[in-house]
């Protein structure tokens, strides 16, 4: 059960904490308060919720904000240097001029956020697109009946990815459809999402309603992975099977 933390209580914690220690604020609720310009460096906020909290200019450097609920928050000019933001809910937030240098935002939800002036560096993880921004390349996906699909994403295809390893494009050529070991070949494969969407070997597949917004992950487009291993990992996760045969799939090249 989450614990409600009042502002004065939080300020006392910050005042009394040893600067060499990491303040544990996991599974807490912060509600209806102004924390603007507060020093929240080196704090563990895993699974905490911020509801109607002003957080502009807050310094979160070296903190863990994984799984934190920040929807609609004003985080303008905040520092997330070297922070972990795995699966953080940042929908509808104001991230204007936020510093993400060295931050890891894997799985963070950035839908409908204001992102003008965001600062990143070479150590920022999962902010850049996973797939090549230009040119043609090979990709992989899985379909019904444990079928593995190898795709060619053409140079003129629109492509995008959010903060996960999944990518999307508006069109692709189907190079091969096989079983997970690539020993049994098929002529076609049926999409998980749309039973009428069929990938046919040698033909182009065109997405219905491709959404160019890169921060929307579950939306229109042909979804794919950059590696066979990632595609097979996804296949195992949705099937819920950790069988020996599944292990063999990932080991086969």
Outline where the language-model segments fall:
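Short, low-complexity, polar/charged sequence segments that are solvent-exposed and flexible
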Residues: 43-45, 168-172, 241-245
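Glycine-rich loops and low-complexity Gly/Arg-rich segments
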Residues: 48-50, 175-177, 248-250
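Extended catalytic/binding region for NAD+/ADP-ribose chemistry, centered on the ART fold
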Residues: 214-235
């Amino acid at each position: 059960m989450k614990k409600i933390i009042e502002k004065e209580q939080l300020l006392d914690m910050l005042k009394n904490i040893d600067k060499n220690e990491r303040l544990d604020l996991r599974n807490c609720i912060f509600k209806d308060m102004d924390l603007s310009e507060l020093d929240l460096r080196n704090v563990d906020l895993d699974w905490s919720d911020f509801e109607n909290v002003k957080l502009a200019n807050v310094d979160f450097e070296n903190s863990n904000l994984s799984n934190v609920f920040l929807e609609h928050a004003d985080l303008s000019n905040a520092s997330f240097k070297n922070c972990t933001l795995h699966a953080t809910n940042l929908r509808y937030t104001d991230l204007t001029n936020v510093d993400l240098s060295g931050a890891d935002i894997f799985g963070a939800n950035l839908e409908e956020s204001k992102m003008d002036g965001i600062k990143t560096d070479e150590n920022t993880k999962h902010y850049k697109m996973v797939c090549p921004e230009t040119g043609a390349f090979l990709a992989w996906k899985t379909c019904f009946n444990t079928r593995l699909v190898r795709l060619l994403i053409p140079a003129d295809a629109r492509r995008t990815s959010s903060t996960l390893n999944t990518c999307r494009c508006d069109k692709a050529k189907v190079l091969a459809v096989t079983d997970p070991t690539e020993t049994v070949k098929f002529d076609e494969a049926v999409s998980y999402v749309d039973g009428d969407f069929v990938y046919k070997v040698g033909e182009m597949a065109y997405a219905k309603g491709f959404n160019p917004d890169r921060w929307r992950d579950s939306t229109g487009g042909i979804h794919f992975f950059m590696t066979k291993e990632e595609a097979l990992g996804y296949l195992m996760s949705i099937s819920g099977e950790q069988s020996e045969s599944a292990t063999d799939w990932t080991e086969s090249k």
